Amino acid sequence: MIEAIAHWITNYISTLGYPAIFVLMTLESALIPIPSEVTMPFAGFLVSQGYLNFWVVVLVGTLANLVGSLGAYALGYWGQEKFVKKFIKKYGKYVLVTYDEVETAEKWFRKRGELIAFASRLLPVVRTFISLPAGFSEMNVFKFSFYTFLGAFIWTALLTWVGFTLGERWDILGIYFHKFDVFIIAGFVILAALYVYRKVKKIKKSND
């Protein structure tokens, strides 16, 4: 699974350059499991070949990360009672998550939100989903944006530098991320399920 996605990502970036980096990094931060561990190192490799500029790549990746994160934050902020919490109340026991645990996580985020928002940007997989609890806890959006930008800047700069340094061996990072195939597959399954749910809901409304 990861190989197919990596192949598509590299072709996309090779064709469109900076716009492709922006789109991919935005999606990754907006709950779509597009691995930045592929996007940014490959962009770094292109920097080493003279096709892209290092700091422009880092800035584009960081801004895209912020944009996508704000989208996920808004989903958590505005949709918590309408969708997420209701879902957990009803079905949480089937995925080993209770409503009380969600409430506890929110309180923890309220107390240490800045640290979590920053540190989570340096963690694979977690960084894709951390914006939701930030929205749940109604973390100050300006603080969230600042710490997200700061953490994302470090992450994108590090991955770009790794790709630049490794050169043609940039994809060596890929062998360490096969373990996350299950998260990628689960992400696409969830998206497909949401799409079908919306379609069915629209059909029911039109019939009523």
Region annotations inferred by a language model:
Residues V125-F129, F149, F153-T156:
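Hydrophobic alpha-helical transmembrane bundles that constitute the permease/transmembrane domains
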Residues L158-R169:
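Transmembrane alpha-helical segments of integral membrane proteins
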Residues F22, S29, F42, F129-P133, ...:
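Alpha-helical transmembrane segments of multipass membrane proteins
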